[in-house]
Amino acid sequence: GKGVVFMGSFSKTMATGLRIGWTMAEEQVTDALLQTRFDLGVSPWVQRTILEFASNGMLEKHLEKVNAIYKRKRDAMLAALDERCSRYATWTRPEGGYFIWLTLAETVDAKKLAEAARELGVAYVGGYAFHIDGTGQNTIRLAYSFANEDEIPEGIMRLGRALEQASQS
């Protein structure tokens, strides 16, 4: 629509090292963006390769494959959470993306959880890191994108133990 600028990146869909993005907007806006000529030194060869990859249908095939992998990982994490953690938290059921957000039950001490999880070898990001107003203390973000699908149940089992240790009930 008029006045809308849509931007994206190939960093998440193809490879994290690719610092190439794209923009869809009215011609006047894209012309102004092109005048900046600021590209962080991205190789013209890499840019051309991405253009060919996207233009000949390979990007769609790649995305189908990647989406199937992420869906399996997400489903594995959701199943493990349902089995092990429902007493201590609720969570999102994302349609896409890379993360599941947990909201801790009032009985769970977030600081104790961080300590217990660390001791059990579980890494997550506390939700407070995503809030500028001090909220989010009772939330955590779990990433399933990088995790090995076969290791997800074990990781969630450990998280469940940490939640149990951090629970006051």
Regions found by a protein language model. Give the residues of each.
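Short, conserved charged micro-motifs
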Residues: 108-113, 150-154
